[in-house]
């Protein structure tokens, strides 16, 4: 009996040790086929558009999402609900220091720091989001199906010192940007 228990403990220890050595697989995002879709709200409505990724990757261990990192090209901000002069004006304004200050801050980053499975192919994630040099944690859901992943984030722009158009800080509470 003692030998059987000892053998079970040895097998369990070997199995647990082996699981600690499961390789992390990094899958690079195809940035030519991927985009950030955004929708920004204002008092009188909203605007939406896209931003390109410079790079991105997701990390998996035994086919389970464990992390990732994305670098967003803020110079690529593109409003898609307007055209002509109004589109050009809004794109320029979003790139200016009033909003994202892309000359000084050409990229934004999202580094996934914690992932918990919430269902089949679904995860609750926490990441460090850096916009305009300011890094804050953000929680979101991410779904991964084969080679496709989608996530939706709600970001309070005022937390990143993007307060254009407000009389005071309190006027900006509740302003958000949806990213998918």
Question: What would you call each of these model-derived segments?
Answer:
Residues 1-26:
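Bacterial Sec-dependent N-terminal signal peptides
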Residues 20-180:
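Low-complexity, acidic/polar, glycine-enriched regions of mature
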């Amino acid at each position: 009996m003692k030998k059987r228990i000892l053998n079970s403990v040895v097998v369990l220890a070997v199995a647990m040790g082996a699981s600690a050595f499961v390789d992390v697989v990094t899958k690079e995002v195809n940035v030519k086929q991927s985009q950030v879709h955004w929708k920004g709200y204002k008092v009188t409505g909203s605007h939406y558009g896209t931003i390109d990724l410079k790079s991105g990757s997701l990390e998996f261990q035994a086919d389970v999402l464990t992390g990732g990192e994305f670098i967003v090209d803020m110079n690529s901000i593109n409003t898609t609900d307007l055209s002509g002069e109004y589109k050009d004006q809004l794109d320029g304004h979003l790139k200016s220091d009033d909003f994202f200050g892309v000359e000084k801050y050409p990229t934004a980053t999202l580094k996934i720091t914690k992932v918990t499975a919430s269902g089949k192919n679904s995860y609750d994630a926490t990441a460090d989001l850096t916009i305009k040099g300011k890094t804050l944690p953000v929680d979101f859901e991410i779904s991964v199906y084969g080679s496709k992943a989608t996530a939706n984030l709600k970001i309070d722009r005022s937390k990143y010192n993007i307060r254009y158009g407000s009389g005071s800080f309190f006027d900006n509470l509740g302003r958000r940007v949806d990213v998918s």
